[in-house]
């Protein structure tokens, strides 16, 4: 259940000495605007950052979101490039009787700039899932100031097929293209 999943996340955070902990896309088990975010923030050590993905709800819209949480602040980045038929139904007005997506009907594209600063003034480009394949969407003057790229994803649904491996290698290619680890 979701409470047990959150307890496991909190336990991992509490027991870790790492400065940055990165969890998968949609790993946060509740809607992000839920007060349970405080439970994560309260268990973060000083100079520690947790990066985790989840679903955010705001003004009747759902967003696939990356959270950057430290002891004093929570930043978020909403996915800008959504997966057709997975995160939204193209031509919904014509196909409104088709229910392909479990959960919210459609996610909404994010509008926030792509750069997050960690506590130690290091900056990274947040990327969610398959956004990494659209290199021209990452070519933003703002991103040239980034120190590295973080791509959170949940490729478990691919199983043992090629998808996760292709995703991993595309991420490596982007890092080389942008000269970022």
Predicted features and spans:
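Solvent-exposed soluble domains appended to multi-pass membrane proteins
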Residues: 7, 11, 15, 22-181
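A solvent-exposed beta-alpha-beta segment
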Residues: 4
